[in-house]
Every structure is written in C-alpha cells, then in structure tokens.
C-alpha cells in the first residue's frame, strides 16, 4: 500500500537514527530534500550536524521560528517495523523522526505559499545529549536569522491523534545529569579490614541521596533524583576499589536545582570522610526548564481550538527535560505535546507513533503560521 510523501520521509529518517552531533546521514537527508525546494526566497546554512533554513517573507516585520530536534537514542529497536533502524543499537525512540518530518512539511508549505514574515527552520542536533540548543542559539549562523517568535513540539504517546496539549508558563522541568565516581582501596574479600569497599560506599550514597528530596526540597515544589546505573568491582571475591553512580536530577524550579546540587555535594563530602575515599562529581548536561510565553501560548491555544480541527488540552507540567528551554530563555515562544497514540512510551524500544499525526500537524501548523505571519 502506498504511503503519503511525508509518511515516507518519516520512515526514511526512522531507518537512520544517529546520536548527538553524529547525525551526518540525517543532515544530508534534510539537505537533499531542501534541495528540491530551493528558489530565490530560500537560504540554507549548515551548523555542525544541524541545518538552518530561511524562507524570506513577502513583506517581513518579524521572524517566526520552528525548531525540530533530529537525533536518535542508543536503544536497540523492537518495533518489528519493516523500516526499522539499520543502525545497530540506535533508534528514533523519542519521535525526533516525526518532529523533523513535520518541520520539512511545514517548510514545504512555506515555500509553496509564502507569507509576509520570514520563517526560519532549525533542524537541531543533540537534544538527547550533550545538548544542541544552547550552542546553536549562540552560533553566528543563527544570530543572523534569530527568530522573534519560536515554537517547538514533542510527540506524546498518551494523547490521541488530533490532540495537542500545552499550558502557559512552566511546561517541562529543569534537568541535569549526575555522575559520581568513588575511589577507595581494593583488596581480598577475606581481609575487608585492609581494604576500603566502594560498593558499600556507593550503597550508602544512593540511600542518602533520597533524603535530599524528602528533607531538603519544599514539599510544595517537586524534585526527583534517580540513580539509573551503578558500576563497580570486577569479580565476586575482590573488594571493589572503584564505583560509579549515574543518574539524573529533575526540579520544577531553578532554585530547587541549586539547592539539590548543594546538598548532593555535602552528602558526597560526607561519604568521602566516612569511607576515607576520593569522590568526583560531574553534572554532565543540564537543560533549563521549558517556560512557555503566556500570551503567545494562550493565543496559540485559542487559535488551534477555534480555527483548526485539532482538540486542545490544558495539561500539567512534566518532569521531562528539553533543551528547547534555552531557546525560550532568549526568544518568546512555546512548546506543545502532539498526540500520537502509542501503546509504548517515549524512550521505549517498542514506541510506535501513529503516522496519521504527521499530516495533521503539518496542516494545522501551516494554518497557524499563515495566520500569525500574514498582515491582516
């Protein structure tokens, strides 16, 4: 059975997921497609493994931006798709193949029927890490075409097709990676008094970290520390010289993130003293909260509800992390959830978004952009 042009594009992209700042095939695919649209009104820039496209308006007074993240995840796919990933151990398990496809669809509509204002499309690498939004925002390439308004979307498996969900103000949390390396003294399991066990030290640290949430964060605020991975030791009868904890920190407020990190550092210092070991903390990538511009979001929700076929839901904030938050620090705009009705959630090896959502998103976003970017 034949599929639509943009469903096919999504399937093409789904086959070639690549991790952050290694999206060379994805970048080339985007450039090849844009090459079919080029005319005197379209300009293209390459930034690292990303692409920035400008469509000149007929009588521009402002620049409207659309951001699509393009990277995949280090997950082995289990969808059973005929168009499953051909890159072993990598998958588009967060919907960035849909985000990119919708961006290309919106770009196609913009080239076909130009509006008054300029449009800029940001095909951004490395959202899943180490973070592409902030360096792209600071790049010379984008500074020349910096939008006055910017929007982005994220697929939502829990919402039905034909639905969007968003809210004014805080939408997504502040997030930070967390890595703690502990180094003590290894030894024979029969002589624990001559060694310094970093498995035991790591176990104490994991337990103590949870007290930060229950005793150091305002209960009316929200924060989560998750340790998702612990490594240490070599065999069962050798006391481990080293251990490593890997996790994430998520807070709704910026103030809580600072407080949580301060307490983590104090607890780790206590572990060093208690177990006579050395500890190193690395926070890795940190993403700023996604805070939607109130007036623009309210206007967008009203427009979509009254003038399109989409259903609009006012959702609650989520502990999800998104580096789009950095763009919203600098540029007024908003992000919204796009319903794709999947049994399996984000970052799951069996995530299967309903492809019907692609065309619906292109259509209603094109309606919104034309309305927002055309003088009445």
Curated annotation (Swiss-Prot):
**Protein's job:** Catalyzes the conversion of N-acetyl-diaminopimelate to diaminopimelate and acetate.
Annotated source species: Bacillus thuringiensis subsp. konkukian (strain 97-27)
| CDD domains linked to this entry | M20_Acy1_YkuR-like
Annotated keywords: Amino-acid biosynthesis, Diaminopimelate biosynthesis, Hydrolase, Lysine biosynthesis
Instruction: Please name the pathway.
Output: Amino-acid biosynthesis; L-lysine biosynthesis via DAP pathway; LL-2,6-diaminopimelate from (S)-tetrahydrodipicolinate (acetylase route): step 3/3
Is Amino-acid biosynthesis given among the entry's keywords? yes
The name on file for this protein is N-acetyldiaminopimelate deacetylase
Q: Which Pfam families match?
A: M20_dimer (PF07687), Peptidase_M20 (PF01546)
Q: Please list the disulfide bridges.
A: none
| Protein family according to the UniProt entry | Belongs to the peptidase M20A family. N-acetyldiaminopimelate deacetylase subfamily.
Enzyme class, top EC level, equals hydrolase
């Amino acid at each position: 059975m034949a599929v639509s042009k943009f469903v096919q594009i999504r399937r093409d992209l789904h086959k070639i997921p690549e991790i952050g700042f290694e999206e060379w095939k994805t970048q080339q695919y985007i450039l090849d497609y844009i090459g079919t649209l080029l005319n005197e009104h379209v300009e293209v820039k390459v930034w690292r493994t990303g692409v920035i496209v400008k469509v000149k308006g007929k009588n521009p007074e402002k620049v409207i931006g659309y951001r699509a993240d393009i990277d995949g995840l280090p997950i082995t796919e289990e969808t059973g798709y005929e168009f499953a990933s051909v890159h072993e151990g990598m998958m588009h398990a967060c919907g960035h193949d849909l985000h990119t496809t919708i961006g290309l669809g919106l770009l196609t509509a913009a080239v076909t029927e130009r509006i008054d204002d300029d449009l800029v499309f940001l095909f951004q690498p490395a959202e899943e890490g180490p973070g592409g939004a902030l360096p792209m925002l600071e790049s010379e390439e984008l500074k020349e075409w910096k939008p006055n308004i910017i929007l982005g979307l994220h697929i939502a498996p829990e919402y039905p097709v034909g639905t969007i969900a968003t809210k004014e103000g805080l939408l997504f949390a502040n997030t930070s990676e967390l890595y703690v390396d502990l180094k003590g003294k290894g030894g024979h399991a029969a002589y624990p008094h001559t060694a310094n066990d970093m498995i035991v030290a790591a176990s104490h640290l994991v337990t103590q970290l949870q007290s930060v949430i229950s005793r150091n964060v305002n209960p009316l605020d929200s924060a989560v520390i998750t340790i998702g991975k612990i490594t240490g030791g070599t065999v069962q009868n050798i006391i481990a010289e080293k251990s490593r904890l890997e996790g994430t920190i998520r807070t709704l407020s910026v103030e809580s993130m600072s407080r949580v990190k301060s307490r983590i550092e104090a607890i780790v210092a206590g572990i060093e003293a208690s177990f006579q070991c050395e500890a190193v903390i690395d926070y890795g990538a940190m993403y700023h909260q996604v805070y939607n511009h109130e007036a623009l979001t309210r206007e967008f929700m009203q427009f979509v509800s009254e003038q399109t076929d989409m259903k609009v839901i006012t959702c609650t904030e989520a502990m999800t992390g998104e580096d789009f938050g950095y763009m919203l620090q600098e540029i007024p705009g908003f992000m919204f959830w796009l319903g794709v009705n999947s049994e399996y959630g984000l970052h799951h090896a069996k995530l299967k978004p309903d492809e019907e959502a692609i065309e619906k998103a292109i259509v209603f976003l094109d309606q919104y952009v034309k309305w927002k970017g055309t003088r009445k």
